[in-house]
Amino acid sequence: MPGRQRRDGGSGPAGQNGPNTGDNRGGGDRRGGGRDDRRGGQSAEKSNHIERVVTINRVSKVVKGGRRFSFTALVIVGDGNGLVGVGYGKAKEVPAAIQKGVEEARKSFFRVPMIGSTITHPVQGEAAAGVVMLRPASPGTGVIAGGAVRAVLECAGIHDILSKSLGSDNAINVVHATVAALKGLQRPEEVAARRGLALEDVAPAGMLRARAQAGSVK
């Protein structure tokens, strides 16, 4: 009987602490859920961008103790509406390298001048031994481009364009040559203002008609 009393006594004030501890743990879960909700909101904002991994390579570094292997990733990120960026990430694991590439691409965003679903004028870009030529195309043409060039154009939101890659077929050179070409695009208004001419004297009639149909230049 005394043993029973001791057991019953143990379920007294000390036993009441058990439910209180459970409530505190429940509160911790609620706080954690709040953080998850906030993180979910941030990931939802980032998910609006288009991400394309162009190439993943394994590289090695010779050190005193042997070789150290790591991975590199070339990533294109864009909003599909004229905004695009290129990033290059390096890490010991592939997911970490891709994430670093995405973060670098977001920091290098730039705006591509467009008329509707194509570019404003023919342009050529060069990077190292890579050369890429881009030409505007009529609606319905589609993206006539190879893998690396296509990734950049689709992330930028260009749906009708003609392209040709010359020189090196290295993906890094081709991507940077494509970016150089897109950065070389100019708006007709900028050219007319710099030359002191009217817009009709600078832009072809077909471009003006296409702009009128598609709206303002992005």
UniProtKB/Swiss-Prot annotation:
SUPFAM superfamilies: dsRNA-binding domain-like (SSF54768), Ribosomal protein S5 domain 2-like (SSF54211). It comes from the Bacteria. Residues 49-112 form the S5 DRBM domain. One of its GO terms (cellular component) is small ribosomal subunit. Pfam families: Ribosomal_S5, Ribosomal_S5_C. GO terms for biological process: translation. This is Small ribosomal subunit protein uS5. The lineage of its organism: Bacteria, Bacillati, Actinomycetota, Actinomycetes, Mycobacteriales.
